Amino acid sequence: MKNNAFGKEKGWIELIYGPMFAGKSEELLRKLKRLDYADVIYQVFKPKIDTRTKNKIMSRDGRNMDSFEFDNPYEIFDKLLSLEVNPHVVAIDEAQFADESIVDVCQALADSGYIVYVSALDKNFKNEPFMVTAKIACIAEYVEKLSAICTDCGAPGTATQRIINDKPSNYDEPVVQIGNYETYTVKCRHHHKIPGKPFPEEIKKFKSDLRNLLKNKENK
């Protein structure tokens, strides 16, 4: 391997996150392909629950790379210890599907000298944070947040919208549902809809009072 920063005993975490269709896996693949030019050895992982591509991570433009699938994040340790050649970089795609032990795994890997690339959704279809991703963002040295395009207005799409029978999913539906274009789209904050989402009375009152205030000003 060429003499570069990846060959030194330094570890860190880089997180790529955002909504669906923002190019997270594509960016992860780009970063990994770039390592090939410097002969940097890497190993790719993803949670087994992601059944869209078996033993591969794949971008929506068709690029892909072999990966090791795990049920328990601690299996990452076992896989690394079994390899004949120890990698310098560990990449984890779709990390939001892992349980919260993935946070400790990423921390331990970086502490042990690995460079850790993580790709994950930032929020679920309810527009609420995936806590796994939020915690990784707190411990990562480098964080890159991507956005997509709102399919209604073309503004930055930052919220993943789940669609069932051509309608937005209700708030009380299960968080995890594996899908692609047939199930999900992306909206901006103003076009994202979550039927049945509860709001504190204080927020309801503020929004109502603000609407009335603005309406009264328009009528003057």
From Swiss-Prot:
The active site is at 94 (proton acceptor). One of its GO terms (biological process) is DNA biosynthetic process. GO terms for cellular component: cytosol. Its main location: cytoplasm. Homotetramer. This is Thymidine kinase. Belongs to the thymidine kinase family. PROSITE patterns: TK_CELLULAR_TYPE. Pfam families: TK. It catalyses: thymidine + ATP = dTMP + ADP + H(+). GO terms for molecular function: ATP binding; thymidine kinase activity; zinc ion binding. ATP binds at residues 18-25, 93-96.
